[in-house]
Structures are given as structure tokens and as C-alpha cells.
Amino acid sequence: KRVRRHRGPGMRAIGLAALALAADRTNRPTNIDPEEIDSVVRVAEAVQSRSESAIRAVTKEWLERAHRGAGYAENAAQFMSALGRLDEAFAVLRAYYFSEGFDCGEVRFERATGSFTPRNDRQTAILFNPAMAPLRRDERFTALIMKLGLPDYWRASGRKPDYLA
């Protein structure tokens, strides 16, 4: 029952069936701390219920997690975007890409896993995941991608970004 230690399930997979699978504790991966799975389950429950108190609670939890690692920050930004917490999502992304507000560091999740995301090699693909659609519709997204230099990349490649096609 070992699985790859990637904790970013993406919001596409979250639904009632996913919640039912997560509730089956006997078949969960044995190499991931149950609290890590539970933290994502709480996000899925907030997405399903749209309960303001649940959304507030997972936003607070994942803001705290974002301070502990780059992988947590990637997940936090996606979760917050999907939950409509765009101010918080942008704050996490500013920390992740530019160390503004706080520094999420280079460790992805836990130092023991030996997985790192160097500050000079941050992932940009997460910006185009389905969970980030609300974020992309916000005017601050253009400023973010400009600061990251993505329009220069697209111009040089001669291709339009997929999300604008």
C-alpha cells in the first residue's frame, strides 16, 4: 500500500466518491501520515459543503501549512483558489515565488522525504490547474505572471498560453 508521496490531488478528483475513499482508513497508504490525508479531506469537505466555517477553518490550516514547505504552499494556493479565497491564494503565491510576506522555504513537505523545490526553480504549472481558474480570472493574475516573466517566455516561444487559447 505504498504510493508516491505527492500530496497535491488537484481539485478535479475531489468529490463525494473521493471523500468515501478517504473515509476508508484501512486502505489508505501506509507511508503517509494519516493527518496529511485528513487535512486534504477537510478541504474536500469544505469544497462540497461550501460551509463558511469549514472554509475559514481549512484556509487557516493551509495558510499555516504553507509556512512549512513549498509543496504545502503549492497545495494551499490551489485549495484557497478553489474555495474562493483569492486574497489568501495570492498571498501564498507571493510567498512561494518571491518570499514576500513569508518564506515557505525549499523543503516540499517534510525534510525526511528529501524532496525540495529550490527558490530559483518554482513550479508555474500549478497556476494553470483547474482549481486555479478563479485566480486566473482575477486582475492580479496578470501582474503575477508578468513578474514571473511568463509573457516573455510565451512571446519568445511564439505560442499563446493554453489558458488564453
Go through each PLM region and give its residues.
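Alpha-helical protein-protein interaction modules
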Residues: 1-165
